[in-house]
């Protein structure tokens, strides 16, 4: 006589999350083509990530905007279920507040579980912060679980990637193998988010998703022509 089926003896693989925290400058200076291009880039990235999610990995996306004040949009949410709305530009550039929120998300094990892969925090800004940000950045990159995160950054326009703006972005990515991405026109925002997308999707398919590919390696792997548009956008 055959024994009864015992479901408790069988387990189902649960996808391990790869957290992505987007720090997006929505200050007044981002109005016009810049905020329009940013909205499009984020939407395309989420669309691509939702197609790449699988039984063994998912992309856990959090979006923190800073313009007037800093706030976390509904999240963290996996890319498939993300309901991204339209970002609007206005106010100052309270980066310090945004960095604090990012730190809290990563340290909180209810939002970034211990079983998650190494998070990536992505900073996009077009200028110099208007609040006190130095101590919060030090805390993010030097202390706790957040210090182990990968970090990528893009400066939009010369105010962001020259002088004090450049110094801030360089400090943000210190300790990583990334370089500051310079966008001297709104269209290049798309290129940066393609790079971010390639980085996390490459990691999700690798033997060890905690290892971060270098920017140069991603450029070498980038498809061309129609294939590039089909794969990434």
Residue ranges of each PLM-predicted region?
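Acidic, polar low-complexity linker/tail segments
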Residues: 1-21, 26-36, 107-108, 113-114
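Short beta-strand-loop
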Residues: 8, 57-86, 161-174
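…and closely analogous acidic/polar surface helices at protein-protein or active-site interfaces
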Residues: 18, 28-58
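Short, charged loop segments at secondary-structure junctions
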Residues: 30, 69-101, 128, 143-147
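Exposed acidic/Ser/Thr-rich ligand/metal-binding surfaces
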Residues: 96-149
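Von Willebrand factor A/integrin I-like adhesion domains
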Residues: 153, 158-213
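Extended acidic, low-complexity intrinsically disordered regions
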Residues: 186, 207-233
